[in-house]
Amino acid sequence: MSLDRIMNEAISPWMKGDGPDSDIVLSSRIRLARNFKKYQFSTMQNEEEAKQIHELFKKKFIKKPVEPFGEFELLKMNELNPLQRRVLVEKHLISPNLAGTEYGACLLSESEHISIMLNEEDHVRIQCLFSGLQLSEALQSANQIDNWIEEQVEYAFDESLGYITSCPTNVGTGLRASVMIHLPGLVLTKRINRIIQVIQKLGLVVRGIYGEGSEALGNIFQVSNQMTLGKSEEDIIADLKSVIQQIIHQEKTARELIVQNSSIELEDKVYRSYGILANSRLIQSAEAATCLSDVRLGIDLGYIQGISRNILTELMVLTQPGILQQYAGGPLGPEERDYRRATLIRERLRIEQN
């Protein structure tokens, strides 16, 4: 694996599979927050300590394959340009917070299933991504990496509290489980706000596709746990999975309701969005996300034949500003991005139809 491949292949290998409930659930993510006993928290550490953590991982973990993930590549943020960092964020391989740090780094597995972020809010944040609803499988992989690291270093751990983390809400298991979910039915039936309120009352958090402070572009929401203290990893996963399954049921019910009561209007909306994607010469990222969401819904409901749902997922990633500019070989102005985005979508849909 090389930096060029990571940058030039917009679709991570894990995105190409279809997991359970993939018509509604795009991905499952597990993140484990860990800190080393001998170092200050990342928020307080100096440059020397940050470099020591880089060297520790370079010495003990780079070029040492872990089955079934293969070898890991070390990417230091201060060795990447702003565009490269943005691409990693848009591929969900690092957090926006890590992209903005000077001494952060990331270890990526060959499949990009596993991302180990260094010197973010915590010394180590292990992230594991799976397609569809596969929280338990993602947790199993994350725990395997966690054990691999803990064989070489000593974590900050308290017998009564659990893992010590920079943010109090992560103290305990240090586990943040999240699911990326496509909910156009609930948005169109105007039930989404009520659903979000119920989710929040259950102690879960609803965010946009890039986490805290981001928008829910294309009717895609991220649902995650909030507190970890006093609960086991298995309980956190079970609770989140139960809520997600209820949301899936509500989304399917909403879709059925729209088809029964507003079938022609929905079909018109789907095909109008398809027409925009297939014919536009300029399209902004927000409009593209909305149209892609409509067309994906049309595919799921059988209105549109001959186009793979995965193509829509691919285009949602490919049309992000950073990845567009990476493909172009450098920075683009807003109108240039809109032109290239529209061209890319038209060409990709044309290839799919042929």
Curated annotation (Swiss-Prot):
Appears to be allosterically activated by the binding of pArg-containing polypeptides to the pArg-binding pocket localized in the C-terminal domain of McsB. Keywords: Allosteric enzyme, ATP-binding, Kinase, Nucleotide-binding, Transferase. ATP binds at residues 27-31, 92, 125, 176-180, 207-212. It catalyses: L-arginyl-[protein] + ATP = N(omega)-phospho-L-arginyl-[protein] + ADP + H(+). Transmembrane segments: none annotated. GO terms for biological process: phosphocreatine biosynthetic process. CDD domains: bacterial_phosphagen_kinase. The keyword Transferase applies. Residues 24-254 form the Phosphagen kinase C-terminal domain. The keyword tRNA-binding does not apply. It comes from the Bacteria. Its EC number is 2.7.14.1. HAMAP family: Prot_Arg_kinase. NCBIfam families: PRK01059.1-4, PRK01059.1-5. Belongs to the ATP:guanido phosphotransferase family. Catalyzes the specific phosphorylation of arginine residues in a large number of proteins. Is part of the bacterial stress response system. Protein arginine phosphorylation has a physiologically important role and is involved in the regulation of many critical cellular processes, such as protein homeostasis, motility, competence, and stringent and stress responses, by regulating gene expression and protein activity. This is Protein-arginine kinase. It comes from Bacillus mycoides (strain KBAB4). The lineage of its organism: Bacteria, Bacillati, Bacillota, Bacilli, Bacillales.
